[in-house]
Amino acid sequence: MNEIEKEYAKLSKKFKLPKFKEIDNEFEISTLESPSFLMRDILRKIEDKLIFYIDVIGNLVHPDASSLSNMYEVRYFSDDEKDDIYNLFKKLMKVDRNIIEVVLKNDEKEQAAFLSKVFEDWMEIKKELLKYIVKMKESWEKQSTIEEDTAYFG
Protein backbone atom coordinates (compact mmCIF):
# COMPACT_ATOMS: atom_id res chain seq x y z
CA MET A 1 0.00 0.00 0.00
CA ASN A 2 1.56 3.31 -1.08
CA GLU A 3 1.41 6.63 0.80
CA ILE A 4 -1.56 7.90 -1.23
CA GLU A 5 -3.57 4.77 -0.55
CA LYS A 6 -2.69 4.85 3.17
CA GLU A 7 -3.78 8.47 3.53
CA TYR A 8 -6.92 7.78 1.50
CA ALA A 9 -7.75 4.87 3.83
CA LYS A 10 -7.60 7.26 6.81
CA LEU A 11 -9.82 9.79 5.06
CA SER A 12 -12.19 7.07 3.89
CA LYS A 13 -12.61 5.78 7.42
CA LYS A 14 -13.22 9.30 8.72
CA PHE A 15 -15.64 10.41 5.96
CA LYS A 16 -17.00 7.19 4.36
CA LEU A 17 -15.52 7.87 0.91
CA PRO A 18 -15.83 5.66 -2.18
CA LYS A 19 -13.45 2.70 -2.32
CA PHE A 20 -9.90 3.61 -3.30
CA LYS A 21 -9.74 1.15 -6.21
CA GLU A 22 -12.97 2.49 -7.69
CA ILE A 23 -12.00 6.14 -7.51
CA ASP A 24 -8.47 5.35 -8.65
CA ASN A 25 -9.84 3.46 -11.65
CA GLU A 26 -11.84 6.52 -12.71
CA PHE A 27 -9.49 9.36 -11.78
CA GLU A 28 -6.02 7.79 -11.41
CA ILE A 29 -5.46 9.18 -7.95
CA SER A 30 -2.65 6.71 -7.26
CA THR A 31 -0.51 8.84 -9.60
CA LEU A 32 -0.63 11.77 -7.18
CA GLU A 33 2.81 12.58 -5.84
CA SER A 34 2.10 13.59 -2.26
CA PRO A 35 -0.54 12.69 0.31
CA SER A 36 -0.19 16.08 2.04
CA PHE A 37 -3.34 17.71 0.65
CA LEU A 38 -4.94 14.57 -0.66
CA MET A 39 -8.59 15.59 -0.65
CA ARG A 40 -7.90 18.80 -2.58
CA ASP A 41 -5.54 17.02 -4.94
CA ILE A 42 -8.14 14.35 -5.71
CA LEU A 43 -10.70 17.03 -6.50
CA ARG A 44 -8.19 18.77 -8.76
CA LYS A 45 -7.50 15.44 -10.49
CA ILE A 46 -11.23 15.05 -11.10
CA GLU A 47 -11.38 18.61 -12.39
CA ASP A 48 -8.57 17.87 -14.88
CA LYS A 49 -10.60 15.02 -16.31
CA LEU A 50 -13.76 17.12 -16.43
CA ILE A 51 -11.97 19.94 -18.26
CA PHE A 52 -10.87 17.50 -20.96
CA TYR A 53 -14.45 16.37 -21.57
CA ILE A 54 -15.82 19.89 -21.28
CA ASP A 55 -13.51 20.81 -24.14
CA VAL A 56 -14.48 17.77 -26.23
CA ILE A 57 -18.23 18.25 -26.00
CA GLY A 58 -18.00 22.02 -25.86
CA ASN A 59 -16.70 21.80 -29.41
CA LEU A 60 -19.96 20.13 -30.41
CA VAL A 61 -22.03 22.84 -28.77
CA HIS A 62 -19.95 25.68 -30.18
CA PRO A 63 -17.57 24.34 -32.84
CA ASP A 64 -14.49 26.30 -33.80
CA ALA A 65 -15.00 27.10 -37.49
CA SER A 66 -11.25 26.85 -38.06
CA SER A 67 -11.22 23.24 -36.85
CA LEU A 68 -11.96 20.74 -39.60
CA SER A 69 -12.52 17.94 -37.09
CA ASN A 70 -15.04 19.97 -35.04
CA MET A 71 -16.98 21.07 -38.10
CA TYR A 72 -16.97 17.55 -39.53
CA GLU A 73 -18.23 15.87 -36.35
CA VAL A 74 -20.91 18.38 -35.44
CA ARG A 75 -22.83 17.81 -38.64
CA TYR A 76 -23.65 14.25 -37.56
CA PHE A 77 -25.67 15.43 -34.56
CA SER A 78 -29.33 16.41 -34.69
CA ASP A 79 -30.60 19.61 -33.09
CA ASP A 80 -32.16 17.54 -30.29
CA GLU A 81 -28.84 15.81 -29.65
CA LYS A 82 -27.09 19.18 -29.60
CA ASP A 83 -29.58 20.35 -26.97
CA ASP A 84 -28.84 17.24 -24.90
CA ILE A 85 -25.10 17.79 -25.35
CA TYR A 86 -25.51 21.39 -24.19
CA ASN A 87 -27.30 20.18 -21.06
CA LEU A 88 -24.48 17.72 -20.43
CA PHE A 89 -21.97 20.53 -20.97
CA LYS A 90 -23.80 22.62 -18.36
CA LYS A 91 -23.80 19.69 -15.95
CA LEU A 92 -20.04 19.28 -16.36
CA MET A 93 -19.46 23.01 -15.93
CA LYS A 94 -21.52 23.02 -12.74
CA VAL A 95 -19.43 20.19 -11.30
CA ASP A 96 -16.24 21.96 -12.35
CA ARG A 97 -17.28 25.21 -10.69
CA ASN A 98 -18.38 23.32 -7.58
CA ILE A 99 -14.92 21.76 -7.33
CA ILE A 100 -13.32 25.19 -7.53
CA GLU A 101 -15.63 26.48 -4.80
CA VAL A 102 -15.12 23.51 -2.48
CA VAL A 103 -11.34 23.65 -2.87
CA LEU A 104 -11.35 27.39 -2.15
CA LYS A 105 -13.41 26.93 1.01
CA ASN A 106 -10.80 24.45 2.22
CA ASP A 107 -13.22 22.55 4.45
CA GLU A 108 -12.20 18.89 4.52
CA LYS A 109 -15.63 17.64 5.59
CA GLU A 110 -17.31 19.55 2.75
CA GLN A 111 -14.66 18.31 0.30
CA ALA A 112 -15.27 14.71 1.40
CA ALA A 113 -19.04 15.02 1.01
CA PHE A 114 -18.58 16.57 -2.41
CA LEU A 115 -16.08 13.88 -3.46
CA SER A 116 -18.60 11.14 -2.65
CA LYS A 117 -21.35 12.96 -4.55
CA VAL A 118 -19.22 13.79 -7.58
CA PHE A 119 -18.00 10.20 -7.84
CA GLU A 120 -21.58 8.94 -7.85
CA ASP A 121 -22.59 11.59 -10.41
CA TRP A 122 -19.54 10.83 -12.57
CA MET A 123 -20.68 7.24 -13.12
CA GLU A 124 -23.89 8.57 -14.74
CA ILE A 125 -22.19 11.42 -16.59
CA LYS A 126 -19.70 8.95 -18.05
CA LYS A 127 -22.53 6.97 -19.66
CA GLU A 128 -23.90 10.14 -21.28
CA LEU A 129 -20.45 11.17 -22.50
CA LEU A 130 -19.78 7.76 -23.97
CA LYS A 131 -22.90 7.95 -26.11
CA TYR A 132 -21.64 11.12 -27.80
CA ILE A 133 -18.00 10.06 -27.98
CA VAL A 134 -19.05 6.88 -29.80
CA LYS A 135 -21.11 8.93 -32.26
CA MET A 136 -18.16 11.27 -32.84
CA LYS A 137 -15.94 8.27 -33.54
CA GLU A 138 -18.52 6.70 -35.84
CA SER A 139 -18.78 9.92 -37.86
CA TRP A 140 -15.26 9.21 -39.09
CA GLU A 141 -16.35 5.82 -40.40
CA LYS A 142 -18.85 7.44 -42.80
CA GLN A 143 -17.90 7.50 -46.46
CA SER A 144 -17.24 10.98 -47.79
CA THR A 145 -14.83 12.81 -50.02
CA ILE A 146 -12.72 15.86 -49.30
CA GLU A 147 -14.88 17.83 -51.71
CA GLU A 148 -18.05 16.89 -49.83
CA ASP A 149 -16.49 17.63 -46.47
CA THR A 150 -14.97 20.97 -47.36
CA ALA A 151 -18.01 22.06 -49.38
CA TYR A 152 -20.13 21.57 -46.27
CA PHE A 153 -18.00 24.11 -44.45
CA GLY A 154 -18.47 26.74 -47.14
Which sequence ranges carry the predicted segments?
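Long, low-complexity or tandemly repetitive, helically biased scaffold regions used
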Residues: 1-154
